[in-house]
Every structure is written in structure tokens, then in C-alpha cells.
Amino acid sequence: MNSQDLKKRQEKIRNFSIIAHIDHGKSTLADRILEKTETVSSREMQAQLLDSMDLERERGITIKLNAIELNYTAKDGETYIFHLIDTPGHVDFTYEVSRSLAACEGAILVVDAAQGIEAQTLANVYLALDNDLEILPVINKIDLPAADPERVRHEVEDVIGLDASEAVLASAKAGIGIEEILEQIVEKVPAPTGDVDAPLQALIFDSVYDAYRGVILQVRIVNGIVKPGDKIQMMSNGKTFDVTEVGIFTPKAVGRDFLATGDVGYVAASIKTVADTRVGDTVTLANNPAKEALHGYKQMNPMVFAGIYPIESNKYNDLREALEKLQLNDASLQFEPETSQALGFGFRCGFLGLLHMDVIQERLEREFNIDLIMTAPSVVYHVHTTDEDMIEVSNPSEFPDPTRVAFIEEPYVKAQIMVPQEFVGAVMELSQRKRGDFVTMDYIDDNRVNVIYQIPLAEIVFDFFDKLKSSTRGYASFDYDMSEYRRSQLVKMDILLNGDKVDALSFIVHKEFAYERGKIIVEKLKKIIPRQQFEVPIQAAIGQKIVARSDIKALRKNVLAKCYGGDVSRKRKLLEKQKAGKKRMKAIGSVEVPQEAFLSVLSMDDDAKK
């Protein structure tokens, strides 16, 4: 194709993604679009086709973004090339969403006709507006008995401020309105800008590792053209590679002769080292490089940290390799090696949130077959010392000595909770119990309220989401973003077994709850840790001060069994001898801590705060 033909082809390209709150029908709509454009034969069709991970199907959520090419013949008789980039809806995967939106010119905003706008719908719309995308509102599930499309249309206009007069009324499940959506994409989503004759600039928005072909890059071509045989260069580190194959996904990978401006596809170039390619980097040609890199993505900072340790210590290197491969297509995962006296060698990992942590743990166990122990999650604290230094601490065992601490600041988040009016009381009570500060609340419509609180991230990390869902019968939707660091009365609590600290059981807690929290854990551990031949004291301590204690009684042999009568001094002698033996044993004995003990600290019940 000459550059004239390529420019004509470029005018027919439409890049768009679908954004929605969880369960508003995003993956179903994607399935219908694939069927309508006959990209996938009815034989290959299955529900949630783009959610290729088993985990995504089981939980019914989208975790990874996916990009596929479709051909659509519009009513004007022209054939258009669509690139549909599927995005996750959950708050923990906002980073995935921002990456996929950067590769698009338009976004379909799916809103449930019964539930209306939810917290994450808003969060994703603001991301789309930041990227200057054309937004097409679609009101989905109009065939539900509880659907109220007119109310939702007003919500879209009032809450988001979009013109919803031309919003498509659709039902992805029943296949209603799909053609209208496709026609609107043709009319309203702009064709990609960019110059085919300019030096190559391609944005890497994802990558996967293939055991045979090395790292495969998923790219959006912004300027220029790339074909097999070209020598490409990464603009961040200058490394060069020879392109072996380029192509598109339909969802299967299909090889092509070239990828030109506006295309979304993959590039394979025998890249063997995972670290050489970074999501957000720009690819250019080595012999005709672009002057500057594309504006990439802002790096996401992890909010939640936890230690991950292999149960079998010889799996340490396998765990490192597994984490490196996961990091390849999940750029927000961070990890560094750490050691623990109780758990041996492992990694300190940073995650965007609890669901992210959960998904990574499951992927490690399923895809790489590694059994893990996770320590309790913690957040990043700013510890100000008496010599006027500020240390960032994400691991309780790194906390400085209490005598050196001047004050501690912890991260607060701005939590936006959308909830039916009848549950406002329950939400406020829960937020208050989690040390939240009320900011404001406003009514979205007659029945739904948007409540905003400032809540410490450490409280959200544990079980805020579960508690919120159970106290509102699942009706509340929740979104949060980082707000600020504030001074708090925090202390580090150590757990001592037989007088020895167990580093993996330490945690940070607010002074007010320290006594109750310590008591609960000590009692829990008493039930879990097996009895020994000697008495084992379990203590919870803040610095040198013991705040709670419980003893595991020793297993005793009845040494008097063979004394059928006889002198009391003989019995006393035997008992004294046993006592001395136990004392010696206690001095040299060590206590085995079962895995459930670490998990019990993780699943801290809220009993302390009731």
C-alpha cells in the first residue's frame, strides 16, 4: 500500500473502549458487538469471550484489558475498521483503564437502566474526559422489570454533565440497540490523527510473555508504520530488536504484513528479557528514530503492601520468576526481596488495593503452582523521628524504636459511597467506626445518596468493602482516591511467643484500639498454636509494655501414676524433678507457629470495634 492508500484506510479506523461499573453489562456488550460484526463465528462464541483468564470468568469481572480488531460495514456502504479495547471496571484496576483509554479516541459509557450511575462509573468517565475522548452514553438492560431509562438519562446529564439526548437504549443480553451503537461509533468517534510518513512512534500499552517467541508487545501505532524485518528501538533504554512478526487480535492472534498509523496490534521481536520492555514506553525504528517519546502513563504508586513467602523455601526462585512475568503485563505490581525470621525468604509486594492483592495471589497459585503465605496487608506510613528525619515505612518490622518516634502520619483516602437512602445510617455508622471523618452528602435522585468521607486507608485495607456490602445488602457502590497524610496516634504492636518476638505477626494499630486488638489476637493464637511439653506465654506488647497475655498450658505426664500410696515426700520429689525438666525445656524449646496463625492476624474480626 502506498502512503495515499494508508491515509484513506486511516480515515476508516475507529478506536474505542467500553467503560462501566462492575456488572453493568460491559463484557456482554462486547460479546454482542463481536457477534454483530461477525468477528467470531457462533460456534466459537462463549459468554465473556474477551475475559480469557479463568479467574475473570469465575468472578465475572474483567481484570486485564484486551484489544481486538473488527470490521463493520456501515449503512453508508463503507467498511470501517474498529479496534475495541475492553477495560476492567473495578477501582483497583483503574491503572488498566487509563492505559486502554490512552490508546482510544472514543469511549462507550454503559450505564445500567435499573441501577443508574455508580461510583466507579464516575471515576472512569473522569479518566476518559482527561484523555479528551468522545463519550457515547448507552443505557443498558432496558428489558429489566426495574428499568427506568428516563431517570438514568437525567442522571447522566445532571451527575456527569454529558448530553444524553441521543443516548442509545439497549439490552446487550437481548441484542437490542447494538446496530445503533455501531452507527454512532462511525459517526461520532473521530478517526485517529497521526502521520503515516513520520518516523515510527508506537505506544506499548500491554505485553505478554510467550515461552517460544519471548515478550510480545501490544501497541497502538501513533505515527509511522512497522513491518517484519524492521529494527525497532525502545526509547527509554535504547535497546534494539529485530521484528519477527506483527499482527492483530480477532481475539486470536492473526499475522499481518504491516501495522500503520491508528492500528492497534502486536509486535513480536524475540525479546527475551522481561525487564527490557516497560508498559508506557515508546517504540521507534533504530535507523529512523522519532525525535521524542510519546507522553506515556503516569506511574501508579502501590497503596497496599504485604509480604509473600513460598511455603516451601526451595520455591523462592520460582516465585521471583513468576512475579517478574506477572509484572510484565501488570506494571503496577512492585516487589523487592525481604527476609523474615519466622517465614524465611520472600518478597515485599506493593498492590493498588485488596482485590489486586487477591488476584495476584490467586494467579501465582494457579498459573505458577506455588503455595504461598501472605502476611497481613499494611500501608505506607510517614514516621517522623526525634532527629527530624522522615522515614517511609510499609513493613511493621521496619518501624524505628518507639523512643525515637516524634509522630506518625498515615494516608487518608476520600471515599465516595453511593447508597440507597434507607442505608445511609448504616454507612455512616460503619465509616465512623473505621475512624472516618464526614465530609458531605448530596442526593443524586429521590432515593440515592452520595456520601463522602475521609477514612484512613489502613481501615479500608482490612475489610471495609465486605462490611459495606453486608451492611447495605450489596446496594452500596464505593470508590476511593488518595487524599492526604494526617497525624495519627499509631503504635506498633509486637506478638511474643515464649518471650521471643515473631516478626511476621507484628502490625500497626491505632492507640485507641490497641488493647482490644491485642487481646483478640492473643486469644486467637491460644486456640491455634498446638500445646507444647512446656507452658507457652503469648503476649501482645507495645514497646516494652505488655498489654495482653494468655498462656498455653503445658502437656503433662502423670508422674505419680506408679506411686500407689507411699510417702508424700516421694511424690513431691517426683513432681519437683518434673518441674525442673519442664523449666529446662522451656529455656531451650522453640514454638512452631502454624500457618493459620498468620492468617488469623489477617482476618482480624471487628469484634474489637463493636
Swiss-Prot record:
Gene Ontology cellular component list: plasma membrane
PROSITE patterns on file: G_TR_1, G_TR_2
Record's bilayer topology term: Peripheral membrane protein
InterPro entries tied to this protein: EF-4 (IPR006297), EFG_II (IPR041095), EFG_III/V (IPR035647), EFG_V-like (IPR000640), EFTu-like_2 (IPR004161), G_TR_CS (IPR031157), LepA_C_sf (IPR038363), LepA_CTD (IPR013842)
Top EC category: hydrolase
Pfam families, alphabetized: EFG_C, EFG_III, GTP_EFTU, GTP_EFTU_D2, LepA_C
Domain (tr-type G) ranges: 11-193
Enzymatic reactions: GTP + H2O = GDP + phosphate + H(+)
Binding site for GTP: 23-28, 140-143
Superkingdom field: Bacteria
GO aspect biological process, one term: positive regulation of translation
Nucleotide-binding as UniProt keyword: yes
EC number, as in UniProt: 3.6.5.n1
Presence of the UniProt keyword GTP-binding in the record: yes
GO molecular function: GTP binding; GTPase activity; ribosome binding; translation elongation factor activity
Keywords, in A-Z order: Cell membrane, GTP-binding, Hydrolase, Membrane, Nucleotide-binding, Protein biosynthesis
Compartments in which it is found: Cell membrane
Family recorded in the similarity comment: Belongs to the TRAFAC class translation factor GTPase superfamily. Classic translation factor GTPase family. LepA subfamily.
NCBIfam families per the UniProt record, alphabetical: lepA (TIGR01393), small_GTP (TIGR00231)
Summary of the function given for this chain in its UniProt record: Required for accurate and efficient protein synthesis under certain stress conditions. May act as a fidelity factor of the translation reaction, by catalyzing a one-codon backward translocation of tRNAs on improperly translocated ribosomes. Back-translocation proceeds from a post-translocation (POST) complex to a pre-translocation (PRE) complex, thus giving elongation factor G a second chance to translocate the tRNAs correctly. Binds to ribosomes in a GTP-dependent manner.
Name of this chain's protein: Elongation factor 4
Lineage, uppermost ranks: Bacteria, Bacillati, Bacillota, Bacilli, Lactobacillales
